[in-house]
A protein has these predicted regions:
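N-terminal pre-catalytic "stem/leader" segment of glycosyltransferase-like enzymes
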Residues: 1-77, 81, 92, 172-187
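Catalytic core of nucleotide-activated saccharide and alditol-phosphate transferases
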Residues: 56-185
Length: 190
């Protein structure tokens, strides 16, 4: 049986892009959210929660453990790297790509809305209950992350429409950051 097992303790806003990809690319595969195979990955604080998410690809009697690191900083989470067979990373350095054999540079991603606000709340509640024994993240923080996709993100269809190409125009999508450093540096370049 072809199956994807996903750790329910994922940061939904950052994982939504990849969840959409899994759903679209692996049509017909069974998708299961289960914390059991991921108990060894600790989620004790916000940094752990923000690190990314794990899933296992089961096909033809073989299993491949994948961790997707969605952090903006070029930091390898060693415990997650040791756990997985493939470590996908959004922002690695050239040196990291050479040094870490399991590391694959996957490029940027962005959060997308995957359903109505009601269905998102139901999904949040279900996945929180599945992973709560193995996470210190509060339900309030978990729910805030899920609802962020409905409040601040758009469905993928909003990005897939035909558009006229303007030769003197560069498309850039990002969110302004709300901290002291961002006000003086990052946001100025956005």
């Amino acid at each position: 049986m072809k199956q994807i097992i996903i750790d329910p303790r994922l940061k939904y806003n950052y994982a939504s892009w990849y969840l959409l990809g899994i759903k679209r690319l692996l049509k017909g595969w069974k998708i299961v959210y289960d914390v059991s195979p991921f108990k060894g990955i600790k989620y004790k604080n916000t940094a752990d929660y923000n690190s990314g998410f794990a899933f296992i690809i089961c096909s033809n009697g073989q299993k491949k453990k994948v961790f997707v690191d969605t952090e903006d900083v070029a930091k390898i989470f060693e415990d997650r790297y040791e756990w997985c067979d493939v470590y996908g990373m959004v922002n690695p350095t050239k040196e990291q790509v050479v040094q870490y054999d399991k590391l694959i540079a996957i490029g940027p991603e962005f959060g997308v809305t995957l359903g109505s606000r009601f269905s998102t709340i139901i999904r949040c509640l279900k996945l929180f209950l599945k992973g709560r024994k193995y996470s210190s993240i509060s339900f309030k923080d978990y729910l805030r992350d899920y609802l962020y996709t409905n409040i601040r993100r758009r469905p993928i269809e909003a990005y897939e429409c035909e558009t006229k190409v303007r030769h003197n125009y560069i498309f850039h999508a990002s969110t302004l950051w709300y901290n002291k450093f961002a006000a003086t540096d990052t946001n100025m370049y956005r």
